[in-house]
Amino acid sequence: MYYSSGNYEAFARPKKPEGVDRKSAYIVGSGLAALTAACYLVRDGQMKGERIHILEKGPTAGGACDGWKFENVGYVMRGGREMDNHFEVMWDLFRSIPSIETEGVSVLDEYYWLNKADPNYSLCRATVNRGQDAHTDGKFDISDKGAMEIMKLFFTPNEELQDKKITDYFDDEVLSSNFWLYWRTMFAFENWHSALEMKLYIQRFIHHIGGLPDFTALRFTKYNQYESMILPMVKYLEKAGVQFHFGVKVVNVEFDIKPEKKVAKTIIVEENGKKDKIDLTENDLVFITNGGCVENSSMGSQNTKAEYNTEIKEGGGWDMWRKIAKQDPSFGHPDKFCSSPEETNWMSATIETLDPRILPYIKNICKRDPLSGKVVTGGIVTVKDSSWLLSWTINRQPQFRSQPKDHCLVWVYALFSDKEGDYVKKPMREC
């Protein structure tokens, strides 16, 4: 293994790989990771764009990084990303992706200048009693015993955490603390989720701890992340000649498996109801998005509930991964992630304010003008006494370029979609 330190090698451009002009790439999915792979193949791999194929079952790129206005429904953002200084791969890439708003600058330039001029921080992290400040006051409110429970998990070998739950390591010393309120709502953790996942998150985001209570560690984009991140990447790839194949489901990837190596040989696809196959050679690279956090998502509206459908459908990432995993156990165990929807589902909604009388109530909580064009809530505001454990956030407005100037978009999400509401007396998933 070769190691380097410092930034000596960070800015040196790689030589053109030998034989790259004979190689092709097939990328399954078009989310942030898939588009990143394509961008690196173009920039660093110097592969010809027309030899890069992105296979996407939906009509647009972006995966979970979406932002769209649907006719008769309105603006929809299923989720959002919270970025920080240590997204090294992302910042390395976006320094090379041109802005689609400002000529001559990169996406990273825009992002850096925005967050330097308008730094992110929250003035109200949680509420109780219908909008009153819960006065978490930047405190973790955790005992020495609770801190030791977190430390114990942090230092437990991964092998010992297989099939263990968070509640196997944390008791009320942690689970009733402000720390857990901050953490679980920021990262969408349930008490019964994987202890190993919890440990890996702590390791990955340990530098967040100081900025956890007020979100000072976070950075956000100007618009929704489809317009701010995905669209510039798509434009960059299209200009390079990368081939986008929308409406193409990848049903399976078949491997030639030998003791010493495993090689993808065939991609089984479906387009317009017809199945076909792509035969692969030693000059073909395959990048697979296996599973996905919005794979089985459904959409409702003001008058129609989102369908709660737990079926794993053919042509989706989870079903494809199952078929790949059946070929060899080293390809993992997808059912660990997708077989318990009651324990893993959550719900989000995008709310557009049409009545200006709502805005003063929002301002009273977040202590900022929602239509100022600057940071508003600075991250989620958690309704601490909500049966749904509901949180909401307002990023810089407008969130869409097409958004009316006097309208505000609020993103809402909750962890307990099966619980009866405090005001609306039915489960969130029935709303």
What spans do the regions from the language model cover?
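Elongated alpha-helical scaffolds
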Residues: R81-S96, S122-L123
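Conserved N-terminal glycine-rich FAD pyrophosphate-binding loop of Rossmann-like flavoproteins
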Residues: G58-E82
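Glycine-rich Rossmann-fold phosphate-binding loop(s) that bind the pyrophosphate
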Residues: G29-L32
